[in-house]
Amino acid sequence: MAEKQTAKRNRREEILQSLALMLESSDGSQRITTAKLAASVGVSEAALYRHFPSKTRMFDSLIEFIEDSLITRINLILKDEKNTSTRLRLIVLLILGFGERNPGLTRILTGHALMFEQDRLQGRINQLFERIEAQLRQVLREKRMREGEGYTTDENLLASQLLAFCEGMLSRFVRSEFKYRPTDDFDARWPLIAAQLQ
C-alpha cells in the first residue's frame, strides 16, 4: 500500500515538473492543453485525471509550491536577520532568485501562464503578492523599533515600490524569453533601490 502511495506521489510530481518545464519552453507562451501535457509526461489524458481532477488543480499545486517556497524563506530571513536594509535586500534577492531558478513558475508569478486559465488562479497569485507586500511593509515599520529611526516616506509607498521592482524584473525575464535574468547586476541595482528608502 505504501509503495502504491509513493508511486502515485512520484507520478504527481512528474506531472507537475513536466508542466513547469513546458511553461519554461516555447510551449509556455501558448495555452498548454492536457493533451500536450499528457504527451510530455508519456501518459494518457485519463491518467492525468487520475492524479489531478483538472488542469486548474495542477496549477493550484504549482502555486502552492511557489507560496510555500517564498513565504517559508522570507520567514527565515526575518528570523535570522535583524538589520532592516539587509532584510529588505535579502527578500528582494530571494524573489528575483526564485524566479530566475524557476523560469516556468515565473510565467505563473507574472500571470502570463494564467491568461487562459480560471480567474481564481490569478487571484491566488495576487494574494501571494499582497502577503509579500504586507511583510515588506512590516519590515519597514519595524525599523523605528529596531533601529530607533523610521523612514520619512510612507511605508506603504516604499513596500509597493520594492514589490513593483521585483514584479518588473520578473516580467522583463518572461518577456525576454528568459534572456534577461532578474539577478543580473543586482549589486549595482540595489543601491539605486536602497536610495529610494528614505
Curated annotation (Swiss-Prot):
Residue ranges of DNA binding: 33-52
InterPro entries: DNA-bd_HTH_TetR-type_CS, Homeodomain-like_sf, HTH-type_TetR-like_transc_reg, HTH_TetR, NO_SlmA, SlmA-like_C, Tet_transcr_reg_TetR-rel_C_sf
Signal peptide span: none
Stored Gene3D superfamilies: Tetracycline Repressor, domain 2 (1.10.357.10)
Single GO term (MF): DNA-binding transcription factor activity
Keyword rRNA-binding included in the entry's annotation: no
BP terms from Gene Ontology: cell division; negative regulation of division septum assembly; regulation of DNA-templated transcription
Pfam families in UniProt: SlmA-like_C (PF22276), TetR_N (PF00440)
Record note on quaternary structure: Homodimer. Interacts with FtsZ.
UniProt family annotation: Belongs to the nucleoid occlusion factor SlmA family.
Protein name (database record): Nucleoid occlusion factor SlmA
Species in which this protein is naturally found: Salmonella typhimurium (strain LT2 / SGSC1412 / ATCC 700720)
Name of the gene: slmA
